[in-house]
Amino acid sequence: MAQRDGEAPLNPRVDSATGIVVHVVGSRQNRPNLPATGCPFCVGGLEAPQPYSTTWIANRWPAMPDGRCEVILYSDDHDARFMSLSHTHATSIVDLWAERSSVHFARADTSSVLIFENSGRDVGATIDHPHGQLYSFDHVPHRTAARIDAGWVPSLDDQLSVRTDETTTTSVAYASAYPVALEIAPRRRVGRLAELSPDERLGLAVAMQDALQRLTTYFDTTPPYMLWVNQRPSTSTDAWLNVEIVSPWRAPGVMRYIAAAEVSTGEYFTPLVPEQLARSLREHLSSPR
């Protein structure tokens, strides 16, 4: 695929001292922080000339070249949010995630596909319209590889459990750099979204909505959050699909900043006890839908 004007070549730098991978993308310095004239994802906007339910578009400001970055539009309703959509609509988003992931996994130059969402100014979201993104990597990112090498599986610790149903489990992460961190996984071991059955896709969508609703009740307002889907890369034969949802809030409106002692050492100090958070989230039932 031809490289677009302004795109940086896919040639990330690696810090020789730490192994940290850095993509230098100078073109993104010109990316607008907020739309100057209306929302580009609303009907009639720059990216959405016609009404839609869910759809995808190429990212105009890609972090990587060669069509590796896409935007997943959840709804043409600017004020909708993933957790507020009907279960059917939310499942259609999971279906689109699976479809676009499969397209990219089919590329010979793709090893790993990441689906993610940034929601809220505190985590860098620049457009309020409900949307997520897809990044297609030609290698397996370190964290993805580390979780697979460690044999990640859903937690069996009842003290960390938040919710379990016929198809899906939700737990608080045992040890996370973020004060709030949830892990959602299908009960059946599958590696990719495309391998989920229709019932499992519905179950995953409902579990994600439930988790976000519980967090909203817990904080008494919708917190900023980051959500991403961990899928089996092309280099692996076995992995357990899971979704992570994290928030930088440690209390309503109070950020838990990751500062010098943590950045410099890679060790973190969290003020929220995961087991206590799980108990609170179990008690903060999600709103009926």
PLM regions and their residue ranges:
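Active-site microenvironments that recognize anionic phosphate/pyrophosphate groups
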Residues: M1-H129, Y135-R192, D199, Q213-L215, ...
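Alpha-helix N-cap/loop-to-helix boundary motif
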Residues: L193-A207
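Extended C-terminal subregions enriched in glycine
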Residues: G203, A207-D220
